[in-house]
Amino acid sequence: LTTKKNQEEAKVNETSNELASATSAAQEAKENKEKADKAVETLNKQISAIKNLTIPQLPQNVIDAYKAYLADDSDANKTALNDIIQKWFKNSKYDFGTAITEYSPEHQNIVIKDWSNKDIVLPIDDSEVDLDNLTDKQIEALSQYYALLSNNLQEQVWGSHHYIVTEEAVQGVKNIAKAYAEENKPYSSGHSYTALAKDGLDSIAWAGENMNFNNTLLGYGAYYSEAKETRKVRMSQLYREVYDSVISFITNDVHANFGHMKLMVGEKVPTNVRAVGVANSFTASNVGRMHFVEFKGRNAHFEYVKDEQTGDYHSKYVDDYYDTGIAKPLATPFDTSKMEDELTAAKAKQTTAN
């Protein structure tokens, strides 16, 4: 009787174990399918976003007015350029429009929920960014996005472009942004030549800087800002700051005699390649700046060269960082081929999970 009872208990235990094992396998299969579905969905969204990125297209009358102002920077030409830019941009497909807001009992403040123009496509990346410690990869991605936008604008105006992103530019702008943050000065203090000198590298030096306040990130000074509370944001939010800055350098630059537009778009047909780096700085006092720094070789200089045929001397710009191939362009993340390979692999996993 005891033996029979033990046999029955063993059979019950075996059945229970089989059931538990089957349940566990089913749960694991369900989780694997959910992961595979999520991976495919995310990659599809990212690829679509890159292929459909919103890149401002300047109409011919803006280009003509810009070149006219470069040729003759009279007040009349400056006003004419600004008027044409405002007419082009306001309520255009490149204008985010009006903030859609609502009151948040949780934050006891008004929060921005969306924007009236929902058709602008920016890069999608929900990964977290520590505003006090942007990684090299995050800085590289911001730099590449800016290079993509500004090179497109240069192509529209001049028919060629000159921005590249290099490892040195990424490190240089990272150190410069850190120096700005440590200075902890108000935005009104303007460009800091002390911070700009702290690139920390022997090979390069800053040649020009555009800068913009983190308006959207910091709630335009009137709305709730999660960045102020947590000092953390999503990468997509920093892409928005880059886009807003590019637009601002065109549409909100009359007060600076279009100096920001000149640095970004150029004042003549580009002939020399230039490395550019983009990083955000965030001070202890919650002042956020996006920095766009153009770099030259540390020892760049002009030399007087004799023309052997005429005997005349003329100046020649020499920059070993670019001329000798030290500056090596980093591959852009806005090429979807790698993502498409990842999507193929993700779809294979999805099929297996099904």
Describe the function of each predicted region.
Residues 195-305:
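A well-ordered secondary-structure block
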